[in-house]
């Protein structure tokens, strides 16, 4: 399993990828999952801080050479990681 996790404004964000599907988790809860494909975009809105909401995206790009995971909050990249398949 491939995982990218970060702490952002009081929320624990995580993108996971295994042989069957990809998942976006926020504070340990699966917010969206999707079957595998070359490019996946998983998203959810989360409350961070008091009455502040963020649009969170997990973007996963897969090809024969590399698996790239990116976490984005309100269109700003907050974490990135590459893996060799």
Which sequence ranges carry the predicted segments?
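Cysteine-centric segments in proteins
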Residues: 1-85
